[in-house]
């Protein structure tokens, strides 16, 4: 089959449990290609040999998602979920968690070249992916979550409004993004 093409005897696909292993394999010459997040790739890889070391990272479509447990009575409230969304500074998530490799996704998740599929009236709808702490606080206030003090919101029963963010271990982009989101939520009294 395709005799004019180079003959490749074998391909090796190593598995790594974290991006540190992938980065070390890349830097030691054990990898020719990797489909993984490499922090600070310009500085640690490309700058070492700009003629031969390259990378490509989609500027859109790579999204960090929060999947909520809607069996949790607090998260089953759409206004709480919207408040959480408004409280997230996606520019900061991209800058800190994603090393500016990408851009914040559109409210539809159809960003960049995929934006051609937006319905024309979408821009007139509520943009709950916009960073808006004031709107987040309004939604939480209207949902009945009062401030216990300047740092913590409480539920009607007096218990603190808290959620756990569970994130895959070993992948610094996800971990750092979750840390940013956690810090953002503290600004609206969610711990």
Placement of each model-derived feature along the sequence:
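Ligand-site clamp/hinge motif
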Residues: 1-44, 179-183, 191
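Local pocket/hinge segments that shape ligand/substrate recognition
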Residues: 5, 35-139, 143, 156-159, ...
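Ligand/substrate-recognition segments at binding pockets and active sites
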Residues: 10, 115, 145-191
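Residue-level recognition of alpha-helix initiation/capping sites
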Residues: 17, 75, 131, 175-176
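Flexible loop/turn segments at secondary-structure boundaries
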Residues: 19-21, 63, 172-174
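Short acidic, gly/pro-rich beta-turn/loop elements at beta-sheet edges
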Residues: 23, 76-78, 173-175
């Amino acid at each position: 089959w395709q005799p004019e093409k180079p003959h490749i005897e074998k391909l090796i696909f190593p598995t790594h449990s974290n991006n540190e292993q992938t980065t070390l394999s890349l830097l030691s010459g054990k990898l020719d290609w990797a489909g993984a997040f490499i922090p600070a790739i310009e500085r640690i890889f490309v700058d070492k040999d700009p003629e031969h070391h390259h990378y490509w990272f989609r500027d859109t479509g790579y999204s960090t998602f929060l999947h909520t447990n809607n069996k949790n009575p607090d998260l089953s409230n759409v206004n709480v979920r919207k408040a959480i969304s408004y409280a997230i500074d996606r520019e900061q998530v991209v800058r800190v968690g994603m090393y500016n490799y990408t851009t914040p996704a559109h409210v539809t998740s159809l960003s960049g070249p995929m934006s051609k599929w937006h319905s024309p009236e979408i821009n007139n709808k509520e943009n709950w992916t916009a960073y808006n702490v004031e709107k987040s606080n309004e939604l939480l206030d209207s949902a009945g979550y009062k401030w216990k003090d300047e740092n913590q919101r409480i539920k009607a029963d007096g218990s603190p409004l808290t959620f756990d963010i569970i994130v895959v271990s070993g992948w610094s982009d996800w971990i750092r993004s979750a840390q940013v989101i956690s810090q953002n939520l503290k600004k609206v009294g969610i711990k």
